[in-house]
Amino acid sequence: MSSQTAPRRRVTIHELRRMKDAGEKIAVVTAYDATAARLADAAGVDVVLVGDSLGMVVQGHESTLPVTLEHMIYHSAAVRRGLARSSGRAHLVGDMPFGSYQASADEAVKSAMRLVAEGGVESVKLEGGAEFVEVIRRIARAGVPVMGHIGLTPQAVHRMGGYVVQGKDSEKAQQLLRDARALELAGCYAIVLECIPAELARIISSQLRIPTIGIGAGLHCDGQVLVLNDLLGMDDAFTPKFVKRFGEIGQAISTAVGAYVGEVKRRVFPDDAHSFHSSTVRLVPAAPVDEDDGEPSGGVMGAPV
């Protein structure tokens, strides 16, 4: 019997469905660059999402609205390269940003196909409920799997009046359940449930055949998603209720950079261990360049031979 570890099964949309049926929880991480993707994949995440949240986390905007399709393609391609440097097991999903699918189904299909062809994603995610059923059908018919996203949908932040929990009353909860069913019938292979009551998320998850991925939606979703920067504790100022910090990397980074600055200022870094040396290099006089004619005009030590 071989002592080598068998390769982990590549996560596909069919594998995610199998995981739901088997009661196996799905771990999703949002990442934006090659290094983060490589580390997340090596840690065993099932899905890496390149989220349009990069507008806030990476670009420093107040919302996701300024993010363009070009931005999403750029970051998706970087994440794809990172996954290629690891096991490449994780399924890669790319967000469809604001303005890339709302205008028409034709535009949506083109946007989705670009994310696949140029960004290297295996599926796309879009926000919205039953009003996007035809868009989802068209994208799916074009051969691109679609992950839905209901509840708090950040691209609709102005309509929602801010980043607030959705579905807290019976009428709105019923609408979210209808939306979830409509997205499943339209062809979504999974749905993100963001910032809705845990009780509602449990009902939706139990009534759908496709996996639900929760963020701020309680324990009973089929999977969970967090932004890598958030779960690592990169930003002390961002502390939403649904984020658990599994590390305090932000403080560790500040400490490490502070130590670097201190050693530079004290002339401690770089030491011999971090410098290159040669016993054969010697310098001979080199004439400086005359400012008038550009010709050497005197002796200056500095030309290696």
Swiss-Prot record:
It comes from the Bacteria. HAMAP family: PanB. InterPro entries: Pantoate_hydroxy_MeTrfase, Pyrv/PenolPyrv_kinase-like_dom, Pyrv_kinase-like_dom_sf. Catalyzes the reversible reaction in which hydroxymethyl group from 5,10-methylenetetrahydrofolate is transferred onto alpha-ketoisovalerate to form ketopantoate. GO terms for biological process: pantothenate biosynthetic process. Pfam families: Pantoate_transf. Mg(2+) binds at D52, D95, E127. Its main location: cytoplasm. The active site is at E194 (proton acceptor). It comes from Anaeromyxobacter sp. (strain Fw109-5). One of its GO terms (cellular component) is cytoplasm. Binds 1 Mg(2+) ion per subunit. Homodecamer; pentamer of dimers. Belongs to the PanB family. It catalyses: 3-methyl-2-oxobutanoate + (6R)-5,10-methylene-5,6,7,8-tetrahydrofolate + H2O = 2-dehydropantoate + (6S)-5,6,7,8-tetrahydrofolate. Keywords: Cytoplasm, Magnesium, Metal-binding, Pantothenate biosynthesis, Transferase. The keyword Transmembrane does not apply. This is 3-methyl-2-oxobutanoate hydroxymethyltransferase. Pathway: Cofactor biosynthesis; (R)-pantothenate biosynthesis; (R)-pantoate from 3-methyl-2-oxobutanoate: step 1/2. The keyword Cell inner membrane does not apply. Its EC number is 2.1.2.11.
